[in-house]
Amino acid sequence: MMKKVFFAAFVLLIVMGFAACSNKQVPVSTVNLQLQNSVDSLLKQGMGEYGATEGMAIVVETSTGNLRAMVGLKENSGKLVSDTTLFSKARETFLFKSASLLAALETGNVSLDDMFDTYAGIDVVGQDTIYDHNWRKGGYGELTLLQGLAYNSSIAIDKAVDMAYQDKDVFLQKLEQMGLEKDSTFKGSWPLYALGFHHIKPTSMVSFFNAIANGGKMVSLKSQDSSAIVVDSMIAKKKNIESMQKALRFFVTNGLGKKAESKMVNVAGTSGSIHTDDGIYADFCGYFPVEKPKYTVFVSYKRPEIPVSGGGMAGQTFRKIAEQIMKTCK
C-alpha cells in the first residue's frame, strides 16, 4: 500500500514539474494521505471484527466539501481489495429517514415534540407492514418525534411524513429541493420511499448530512482543491436545520448511536441497518465537533447475515475515525 502511495506521489511531482515548464496549473488533490491510510486501517479492522464483506468510509471537510479520505473495500478470494465503485453505488439506506424528517418539519405541520404511537412495533399501512427494529420485544409505544429518530422508529417517521404531506408528489419535490435526487425506478409505496427503501448514492447522503452540519448550506463534494462550490445556500429553514442538529446530537447521547459518542469530541449523527437483495448494510453518518462542525464522516459495512447494527458497528468506526482526526488534523 505504501509503495503505491509513494509511487503516486512521485508521479505527481513529475507531472507538476512538466506543468511548471508549460506555465499550466496542476489540480491538487484534497486527499490527506496520512488520514487516508488511517481510515483504511480502521476500516479493515472493523471488517475483520464484524465479518463484513464490504466496507466504505468517506471523510469530508464540512465547509469546503473537500474529500479528505475515501476508502472502499470488498472481500475477494479471502483478501480485502480496493473498490472505488462503492462510492457511487446507489442502494437502500435507512439514513434517508433523516431527510424525510426534515422534509416533514419544513411543512410546519409537525415538530420534534409531537407524540406518535408506534404501537407494539408493527403498523399496517395500506398494503405494507412496517416494523420497528424491536418489534419482537414489544415496540416503543408512544414516542416524541425526537425520540422516534433517536430510536430509529420507522413507524414514527412514516406517521410524521403522512401527517405533514397529503400529496406524494409534493413530498418528492421537497426532497429534490433539498438536494436529494429522485429514484425514478422505484416502484414501491410512498411510505417505503420515505423510509429509504429506494436507491440513492452514498455520496448523496453524505452531501445531505454535510449540509446539516454546515448550517443548511450544501456544497459540492470534490477531490480537487478549490474554493467551496455552493449548490444551495440553504436547503431548509434555519429553525428546521437547527431541529435536525438537535435530533442528530440526541441520537448519539440518548439513542441508538451511543457507541459513536466520544470523550474526545462531541459528535452528532444517525445510523441505520437495512436488508437488501445483496446483503445487510450497517450505516452511520455524522459530523463533529458539534459546536463548530469541521468534518462529516460516513461509514458503512455490509454483512451477509445478521446480527447487524448501524450504531454498534459503523458507529464505532465513526468514533475511531473522529478521534484519529482530532489527534492529527486539528
PLM feature spans:
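Conserved catalytic neighborhood of penicillin-recognizing serine enzymes
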Residues: 63, 110-171, 230-243, 250
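Active-site-proximal helix/loop microenvironment
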Residues: 71, 87-95, 180-233
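Conserved SxxK-family serine transpeptidase/carboxypeptidase catalytic domain
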Residues: 220-221, 225-330
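Bacterial N-terminal signal peptides
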Residues: 9-17
